Each structure stands twice: as structure tokens, then as C-alpha cells.
Amino acid sequence: MADKPYDIVLFGVTGFTGKLACEHLLQKNYPIKWACCARSAGRAKDGLSKIAELAGVGAERLPLVELADLVCSTPEQEAALRAVVAKTKVVITTAGPFEKYGQTLVKMCAEEGVSYADIAGETDFFRSMIAQHDATARRTGALIVPHCGNDCIPWDLSVFEMSELAKRRGAELTEVCTYTEYPPGTGASGGTLTTAIYQLGKQKNKEKTDFDPLLRDAAGSKSEYTTKVTSPKKDVWVGEFQRHGGPWIMSPVMANCVRRSNALLRYSASFVYSEAQLRDTSWAQQAKDFGYTALVGAAIYMPGLFQRFLPQPGEGPSRRTMETGWLVVHGRGKMVDRAKGEETPLSSKFTFGEDVTYLGTARMLVETGMVLLEKRGKAPGGVTTPAAALGSAIVKRLQEQTKATFELSESGAKASVTLRSSL
């Protein structure tokens, strides 16, 4: 396999999360060749100099800047973007909405045999990329992996690790419930909200396929391993945690990522998954959450009036806020040994000791890029998921290189859920 000028190229470096990803690469100083790609050399270089100052590194450590536009309207623009893609082994990108800025990039990565990762939280984009480019990626060996940030690594990998434990015990993982804890008042990022508003506000134009592309298996056929999603539609009482839990804006994205992982990795032919976000039980916080949800809904249907009150793409919290943030994803599962007729409860806890909507997401993406680099030429290609493409390697890297810990046991009590409206 011929060598290339770069191991990794980062797209989106002028955005808030892209800058954090660049900072992480500079701080870690991994022994790789990497570059950034942007539309404007001046803007990118100005941003890089500020990032270097924050990271405490000299200008000599700054990456080269390649120039290309992610939205190509001329043959010249397409040629420039393809030239950048062809120079690298792995592409990582924070530039969204990905349905707008990722389509051509994924296509070129699949065609050039270049592995790709993004921080998308867009199921429509994911489905479309499977339908359009999975066969090409399988042929060229490109690993195309959306959902490599806070959407959806913590949830997808929690389920994966439970399944791996079940397999080691000669059993089958049949059910997982996840319960998510954020600091009170945590909302979605500006980029995530813009993506959600873009997705919900646009005219749906689904491609016609014989079956849901999420169910496509590693050979391109319809998988027999399906997932029933039973996430609550309203707030419920979660007995184990003595708190209310309920739906949130990104839970369908997590569930669809898990659905695809099951189709590829064969957890169970009748797998059941649910997800709830644990909530502060105070009336004041519940009122605040209700108001925030109402504002997001208003911004979707009346963007001219309300969208300006929400965080905008590129906007982010203070450094202190990011460094004191956190996320905990509790997993409660069940594995079944059909030969022995035994059921065993499983318990997991994925903890991130920093904000995950920005800082943690940037670090997850970079570490994903490092795993994809290690797996280059060693794993079959395709449009896949973090669990299927990265496996335990990403959990290990996140624990070694970031403020993340992962715990897994067979002794956890399954959470007791009683449906009861909290408002």
C-alpha cells in the first residue's frame, strides 16, 4: 500500500469543536502526519495560531493547511477536494450539518478507500450514506463511521461492551436500558440544535430502498438481527435511581445507531433497547427544561422569531464550564444462556469527567481517527458504526487519553421503571 503525505486530515478547524479537536491533536503530539483543511487559508491560519497559544505549543508544531470547499458547485472545486482526500489515510470532520457539508466528502472517501469519521447526529444522513456508499466502501476498504462524538459513542459502545461480555460467557445480550445523567441545565450544542432544526424543518425526501438501510448487514443483505426500541415517550419514574427519566431530542439518533450495530454485530435477533435521560426532580429545574424544550420547538417552526435565542453554530461555553462538565451513561442489560436456561443481569457505567457536547466530542473524534489509522487495511470497509468499526479499542483509548472511565459487571440490579407522568 503506497504511503501518503498525511495520516489524518481534519476538516472544520474554523468551527468551535474543530478548534478543540485541533488543540487535542497538538497537545497529544501523536507521531503522525496530519493537516487541516479549510476554505480560507487566512482564517484557518489565524485560528491555528490562537489554538497553538492555548495548547502551549510553538508555531513550528502547527499543521499544514490544505484548501478545499465541502460544497462543490464546479468541477474545479470537486477536483480540489478529491486531491485533499487522496492525500490522506483518514479524514475526520466536525463540519455540519453533515447532510449539507458531508455528502461529497463521504462519497470521495468511499471511492478513494479513505477512512472517515464525523460527529454527526443525523439519522437521515446516516441512512443515505449507507444506501449510496456502503457497497463502494466495502469494495475499496474504506471505513465510513458517522456518529463518533457524544452522538453516539457513549451509548453505542456501552451496548457493545455488554454484548462482548455476554459472548465471553457463552450467552446472548437480549436487552439493554440506558440511563443518562448530565449536569442540571445542560442543553444541546449550537451545532446539534442547528442540525436538529435543519432536519426537522426540511422537506423529507427519503430514497427508495427495499428495506431500511440501517438493517443492512456486513454483506449488504437485510440482516435478521432487528432491534425493538422501547424508549419512554414521557417522563417515567426510575426506581433504582429515585429520579424521573424521559425522552430527549437525540435519543432516537442513539437508538438508530444501536439498531445498525445490532444488524452488523448480531447481538440478538430480537434485541430490545431503551434510553431515558435522568432528570433533576426539582420543580424549578423541570420548569426550566420544559421552557427550553418549548423554545427549541418554536425555533423549528418559527426560526425567524425564536432561533436567535438558541446557541449558534461555532458558539460554545467557557473553558471552565467545559472542564467542569460531565456525563454518565448507566447501562442495565440482560444476557441469556439459552443452553442453560439462565438469565443474568449486566451493569455498565461510562463516565466522562468533562463536557461532552464540545470538548469530549472533539476528543472522541480525534481518538476515533487514531483507531481508524491503526485499523487501516486490517478491517473490512463499509458505512458502519462506532461499535462495529472501533470496538473495544476506542473505549481503551478514551480511558487512556481522556477523562473517561468504563465499568462493567454481571452483578448490577436492573432498574425498575414505573410509567408515571412527572408534569
What do these predicted ranges mean?
Residues 8-27:
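N-terminal Rossmann NAD(P)H-binding glycine-rich loop of SDR-like oxidoreductase domains
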Residues 97, 108-126:
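ADP-ribose/adenylate-binding Rossmann-like module
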Residues 47-58:
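Short, conserved SAM-binding/catalytic segment
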Residues 66-88, 94-97:
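Conserved Rossmann-fold cofactor-binding substructure of NAD(P)-dependent oxidoreductases
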Residues 18, 141, 164-423:
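C-terminal catalytic/substrate-binding lobe primarily of soluble NAD(P)-dependent oxidoreductases
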Residues 30-43:
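Conserved glycine-rich Rossmann-like NAD(P)H-binding loop of the short-chain dehydrogenase/reductase
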Residues 120-142:
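Rossmann-fold NAD(P)-binding glycine/threonine-rich loop
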Residues 7, 89-90, 115:
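Structural motif
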